[in-house]
Amino acid sequence: MADVRAEIDRCDRALIDMLAERFGYIERAWQIKLVHGIEANVPWRTQEVIDRVRDRAAERGVPPDLCEALWRQMIGWFIQYEEVKLKDQIAASNKKS
């Protein structure tokens, strides 16, 4: 059992590494959205991501419903994060004006 747990821990570390990489792109995304006046929540993009995630999950033998639930949670968190960042940056810009 210890070897299985060690492999699960290894997978968890890899997931965190990938999440850190994704988070870096979220940081870039909100900055681009700020410059171009794009809302944090872009529903068509969310659906595009979910559809792709479900397809990939099915290809890999992972329950698509599980992956969709995880991604919706993650995307929802990132949208809230972007909304706060955008609001804070707009407020800071308005104070300077």
Q: Over which residues does each language-model region extend?
A:
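Domain-level signature for soluble enzymes in the chorismate/prephenate branch of the shikimate pathway
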Residues: M1-S97
